[in-house]
């Protein structure tokens, strides 16, 4: 039986009526305590990131503005770097938000990794995407624990590339939240990267 993650991705694509470009030939999975990332070496971007968010994960730790995103993938083909985003017009958009790991400085710091970011427009990153992050934290407080999935989406059309290493810019993002005890989906968002 397909996992809830795969069922959510398939359902969102069908409901949106978009044509989704999917290449799974070069995926590697990164397992971290804070999140899991299925990283696409051909796009130099996560294909999906998922994590459990508990009410106890949300704390008072503040992010340090001097933190840079580190290249954390032990594969010579994973060449995306913090500098690829510099002067590109795109933000380094967290998929698993730093604030979801604000119970500890070390946990928050570990979200600053290339396996956990994708190019997002400033309007999306500081607007609707931020609202999905806040909504998920509220849901975690209400339900004590939720699971979250964030998926960059490339449409069947021209793709923009940024940086020296040519990172592929997603056309849209999907995020979903569900209850771990019974896989009940409680929230789904589909947002265009503009």
Regions found by a protein language model. Give the residues of each.
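Bacterial N-terminal signal peptides that target proteins for export
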Residues: 1-10
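A short hydrophobic/aromatic micro-motif that marks alpha-helical segments and, especially, helix-coil
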Residues: 20-21, 109
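Boundary at the C-terminal end of the N-terminal hydrophobic targeting segment
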Residues: 21-27
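Short, His- and charge-rich active-site/binding loops that engage polyanionic ligands
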Residues: 28-91
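Domain-level detector of nuclease and nuclease-like folds
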Residues: 75-194
